[in-house]
Amino acid sequence: MLTHPQFDPVAISLGPMAIRWYGLMYLVGFVLFIVLGNVRIRKGNTVFTPKMLDDLLFWGVLGVILGGRLGQVLFYEPGYYLDHPLEIFMVWKGGMSFHGGFLGVLAASWLFARRNHLSFWQVTDFVAPLVPLGLAAGRLGNFINGELWGRVTAPDKPWAMLFPQARGEDLQLAAGNPQYAQWFAQYGALPRHASQLYEVLLEGIVLFVVLWWFTSRPRARGQASAVFLIGYGIARFVCEYFRSPDEGIFGHSYLISMGQWLSLPMILAGAILWQWSRRHADNRFLR
């Protein structure tokens, strides 16, 4: 059985300034966005320029931070932030929500499209294949931090991992389950899925490969966006069955988690967009 390495959350210390791994992974995601975006631009068949890509990143970063934080507040911890409203602005404390960040990026894409006289789908279809590797970097940051660990699994499974950071939650689970209590007494923590790495694979690497291949030739307007919505929604829905569920606005449930509730509209919206795109397949645009 594996044990989480318990990495130092600080990647680089420069005097009084500390750069944390999680923040560094966000930076990696933004750099990958620029690198992959420039690769697409150099291939041609796109209205985007390097200058437009830089502007798009600026708006995207604002959308990720503002939307991600607002999503964390509204979807996952509304009661806590109602009692501690000033902590809403402490983005380094308490995390951010992907689904909130996604909505923030949609709003940023709409504003960018209006400012540059582009179709909204031109922007989102261009962005879709640039996002997954950034998501993978973020999930890798979660793993390095030893947070958002997976659900309990049997200790004899080759993928079982002990997360010492989860001891508080482990104690609560062990108190109500004799089998868990035995495992906790034996190992000092409960064996869990390393669900962050599953998300790196499915939401990041696999989704990137699918979208990069799909956008390698011109597609009907909105199709790349539809593939992202459906692909991410399904990947997240599956991964949530291995991830320890968060307590959201619908309570704490092991049957269907908050992340799954939020992924269902993405899958539905993607299916609707795909059908709309097929009916307008003659309305193509350059990547």
Swiss-Prot record:
Subcellular location: Cell inner membrane
Binding-site residues, a 1,2-diacyl-sn-glycero-3-phospho-(1'-sn-glycerol): 139
Cell membrane as UniProt keyword: yes
GO biological process, one term: lipoprotein biosynthetic process
Disulfide pattern: none
The protein's role, per its UniProt record: Catalyzes the transfer of the diacylglyceryl group from phosphatidylglycerol to the sulfhydryl group of the N-terminal cysteine of a prolipoprotein, the first step in the formation of mature lipoproteins.
Listed name of the protein: Phosphatidylglycerol--prolipoprotein diacylglyceryl transferase
Encoding gene per record: lgt
